Every structure is written in C-alpha cells, then in structure tokens.
C-alpha cells in the first residue's frame, strides 16, 4: 500500500491561512486555497498528472488509493475539518470549511514575522532595505540575492529555519512593495 505524508500539505495550508488572516483579519468562513499540481507532487514525492493526483486525493483510481484519501482526511480533518479537493487542469482547489479556519485562528500561534511583514509592505514607500532589516531582526541567518528576471527584484530567506522554509521574493513598484513566497522546490520549478 502506498503511504503519503500529509504533514507538508497541512503545514502549507495552515501557513497560507495564517498569512491570509494577517492580511485580512480573521473571519469564520470558507476559504479556498489553490495549488499547482507541481506543488502537490513535491509534497507527496510523486510525479503524476492532474487526474491521477485527484484520484490519489479522492481515494479512487487504478491503484487502491482509498487508504490514501482516508489518511489525508484523517490527517487534515482533526484540525481543518473535511477538506474538499477539486481541480481544473493542473490547478487544485482545497476548500477549507469555516471550522478549519477557526481552528487555525484559535489553536495556532500567530506568525509574528508574517504579521510584521504584511504591515511593513502595506506602508507607502517601503524599501527593500527595510524588508531586509525586518528579516535580520528575526534571525542572524538571513540570505539575500538579487533576481534578474524582470518580474521580481530580490529573494530573501531564513537559512536553515525549519519553521519558515520559504523564499520571499520582492518587487518594488514605485512607492509600493509586493511579495510572493515559495517553498524552495516550487521556486525552482518557476526557473526564476
């Protein structure tokens, strides 16, 4: 029987919900989070197409995926409720019910760094140097690299931080700062 570890998926879902709550505030409502197929393949160590991934997540298909789907729902439902998954092409939607959003709000610690980052980049005139200073305030092990792809200006990340493994990519647009964060494997897929 195939065995998958849902910890990375669950952690990613919780991290995105926390980030959304830092940006918009907490509301007890449904949330739909979208992931490309490549991210799911990274989470599960697979290399399957969209339809097979849907079968894996549903517990149907050529192989007996029923235990896999049951394991996913068991792993996620105690915290996030009954997560529904659908896809259109290579884009997967994870529908988190209100009780899952409430669980994250009530039972996880606020990510202070994300809250401060969201507040900082919302400030008119925020600079890359201010962003870098925020990173160094939270850790002495920070890396920064320029990006020369025309889409983003700089990538900053915490080195060897299991709690925050993301690459944060920033773009200065006049007086505004935008950012995207990626898990390292997803970042590599984008070939920045």
Describe each PLM feature range.
Residues 16-23, 59, 63, 75-78, ...:
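Surface-exposed polar/charged interaction patches
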Residues 67-109, 150, 154, 158-161, ...:
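Charged low-complexity interaction tracts in eukaryotic proteins
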Residues 2-33, 43:
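Positively charged, polyanion-binding regions of nucleic-acid-associated proteins
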Residues 31, 41-84:
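Charge-enriched amphipathic alpha-helical scaffolds
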Residues 109-192:
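Residues within mature, well-folded domains
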Residues 12, 16, 43, 71, ...:
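Charge-rich, solvent-exposed alpha-helical interaction surfaces
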Residues 1-12, 35, 63, 67, ...:
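Alpha-helix boundary/N-cap detector
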Residues 26-48, 113-119:
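Short glycine-rich, basic-tinged beta-strand/loop micro-motifs
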């Amino acid at each position: 029987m195939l065995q998958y570890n849902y910890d990375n998926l669950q952690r990613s879902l919780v991290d995105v919900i926390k980030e959304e709550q830092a940006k918009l505030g907490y509301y007890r409502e449904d949330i739909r989070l979208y992931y490309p197929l490549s991210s799911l393949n990274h989470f599960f160590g697979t290399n399957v197409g969209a339809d097979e991934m849907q079968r894996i997540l549903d517990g149907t298909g050529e192989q007996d995926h029923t235990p896999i789907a049951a394991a996913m729902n068991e792993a996620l439902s105690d915290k996030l409720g009954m997560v529904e998954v659908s896809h259109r092409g290579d884009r997967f939607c994870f529908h988190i019910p209100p009780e899952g959003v409430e669980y994250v709000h009530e039972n996880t610690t606020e990510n202070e760094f994300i809250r401060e980052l969201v507040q900082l980049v919302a400030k008119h005139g925020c600079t890359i140097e201010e962003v870098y200073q925020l990173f160094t305030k939270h850790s002495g092990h920070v890396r920064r690299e320029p990006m020369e792809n025309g889409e983003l200006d700089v990538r900053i990340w915490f080195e060897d931080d299991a709690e925050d493994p993301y690459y944060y990519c920033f773009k200065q647009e006049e007086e505004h700062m935008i950012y995207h964060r990626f898990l390292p494997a997803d970042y590599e897929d984008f070939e920045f």
